[in-house]
Amino acid sequence: MLELDKNTFEAEVLQAPGKILVDFYGDGCVPCAALMPHIHAFAETYGDKIKFCALNTTKARRLAISQKVLGLPVIAIYENGEMIDSCVK
């Protein structure tokens, strides 16, 4: 699983080909921490089919807002630079 930051998000997600799952999480977010092991398990199982990434929104608030991530945790699927689906838990 690739850990993103505000400097790598564009190249690794918005400019990357194919499908990419991004786990938007935050420091101190209990539901985020509970979800993280499941996302890592999916990455191990399906990592050859989809790129798995995570972004700590505590360190990239403006980026999260630009992606319309207003609550946490958010799991988003990107394809060819566009968010095509998302889920807020």
Where are these regions (language model features)?
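Thiol-based oxidoreductase modules, predominantly thioredoxin-like and allied folds used
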Residues: 2-5, 24, 36-43, 47-62
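A short beta-strand-turn-helix
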Residues: 2-19
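Short loop/turn elements that flank and shape the SAM/SAH-binding pocket of Class I
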Residues: 10-12, 60-63
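Non-catalytic, surface beta->alpha helical segment in thiol-disulfide oxidoreductase systems
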Residues: 71-89
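Alpha/beta-hydrolase fold active-site loops
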Residues: 19-20, 73
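Short, thiol/selenol-centered motifs that function as redox-active sites or metal-ligating centers
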Residues: 28-35
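ABC family nucleotide-binding domain
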Residues: 30, 43, 66-69
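Short pre-active-site segment immediately N-terminal to redox-active cysteine/selenocysteine motifs
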Residues: 25-28, 71
